[in-house]
Amino acid sequence: MTSTFSSLDVSAFTSAADRILAEAVTGDARVPGVVAMVTDRDRTVYSGAAGQRSLGGSAPMTTDDVFAIFSTTKAITATAALQLVEEGLLDLDAPASTYAPAIGTLQVIEGFDDAGEPILRAPKSVPTTRQLLTHTGGFGYDFFDEIYNRLAEEKGQPSVTTASRAALMTPLLFDPGERWQYGTNIDWVGQVVEGLRGKRLGEVFAERIFAPLGIENMSFILREDFRSHLTEIHARNADGSLTPMGLELPSPPEVDFGGHGLYGTVGEYMKFIRMWLNDGVGEGGRVLKAETVEMALRNHLGDLPVTMLPGVIPSLSNDAEFFPGQSKSWSLPFMINNETAPTGRPAGAQGWAGLANLFYWIDRQNGYGGYWATQILPFGDPTSFTKYMEFETAFYDALKS
């Protein structure tokens, strides 16, 4: 790949980043605690923690603390699928039902009749794995979609946070390929991977991704050794105050949900980011071929736009969008910003987020990536997201200097 090797003023960035983290955990609108890191191709160049693991608790936040990483799980599932493509086992453009038969039974919901019953029809096609990876498969989330929310409230459709097989079995919202809509697509990619490997997704990750990356502290199971370092998920109340939620994802889960189910540390995620910065190579071996990385990170969405995420369930998400007014696309694992972002992130960089206000970016042009981790609901928390944007901006300011 063509790269520009920029020089980071590490001292200036460390000073600015430490200040931003300290500000984030101070004042009435504070976050309880935050961990943030930046890596270059070789090592973590900034690692910071501020605040507390749980509001009112005595444990300070540390860089070794464990987070529910929510949708930052998705890119790891995409990586497992890309390995199958390399091996000639997965055809991205074949119906996903070839590998995960249950997806072929799902119908399209067109709304509700006068009696409140779902109006269903057969889809024009079964989603392909490529469509699932690019969020054009037809799925949504109940916290971002009114129809799914109504199915949950009136018909008892289980939430994905139950980690149950029943939670996967939602109708499609539209015919595959029609538009981009963020949803449970990557959970189905996980089912494709399991169908081809004959193993649970967590086992596939451990053997084929975590081992060559040297990742030990990441799992779909909330291990006992994680509990002593587990960061509490908090709710941001309407008045801006915070309440510990006591929320945990089911462990062990009935299904390893490839869209959101991992627990892990930010330091371990740095190893995953470094793999993308190094054309597929981890510290213990190759995860993806360089040509696979290049193929995967192109725009696979065509002219379809990535749109704002509407906060349908206010306790889970605000209206949220990266870089409003700017064009965004989707690669196979990530969102692509098509224009230079206000933070300084260059056009063509990759990134995404997790529901509890976790955010990351991967800038292969300059050879850096970063991750900002908090545990707050709803998504799009004004303090966490704003401070993340300041953190990323401070990085690019120090890179230019």
Curated annotation (Swiss-Prot):
Keyword rRNA-binding: no
Active site (UniProt): 71, 74, 182
Annotated catalysed reactions: methyl acetate + H2O = methanol + acetate + H(+)
EC number: 3.1.1.114
Keywords, comma-separated and alphabetical: Hydrolase
Molecular-function GO term, any one: hydrolase activity
Keyword flag Membrane: no
Similarity comment: family membership: Belongs to the class-A beta-lactamase family.
Name of the protein in question: Methyl acetate hydrolase
InterPro entries listed in its UniProt record: Beta-lactam-related, Beta-lactam/transpept-like, Diverse_Enzym_Activities
Biological role stated in the UniProt entry: Plays an important role in the metabolism of acetone derived from propane oxidation. Catalyzes the hydrolysis of methyl acetate to acetate and methanol.
Induction line: Induced by propane, 2-propanol and acetone.
